[in-house]
Amino acid sequence: VDLYEKGGSYKLKVMEIYQAGAGRINEAFEKLKAELEEMGMFDACYKQKLPDYINRIGVVAAYPGEAVHDIVENATRRNPFIEILVYPAYVQGEQAPLSIVRGIDTLQGRNVDVIILARGGGSTEDLWAFNERMVADAVFNCPIPIVSAIGHEQQVSISDLVADMR
């Protein structure tokens, strides 16, 4: 920083510029997105249709939580006889990706018609577990249709892109 007292101005000398914060996160997101897109994991031909009649829903979400509350409230209002199985998962932090994958795997053996991945809104970092490769693979390879309900509408995760419905 140089100071010019006479004019009362400062001059900044920039020695280095680099992307920080969301830049690196966005770069990782775009890299994985491009890789999975090239593999065809977002292609419509792989999207499973939801059953016409849904009797049993599996939910992978933090429990208790607002996301689960909203799903239960809306589903039972439409069909008071619907069964909802909740797999309580970590949806944020280091343990979250494996916890989400275990939830998907567990619910596959519970005779559910559809699986909902749910997590309320948050920062990109808070939602990052749904951008991990292991979660994308579990969603893509699941024989049961998966609905992704992650974050706010304007937030898009890798899980949203791979899932059968968003």
Specify the residue positions occupied by each region the protein language model found.
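Short, glycine/charged-enriched hinge/interface segments at domain edges or termini
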Residues: 1-87
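Short glycine/threonine-rich loop/turn motifs
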Residues: 54-166
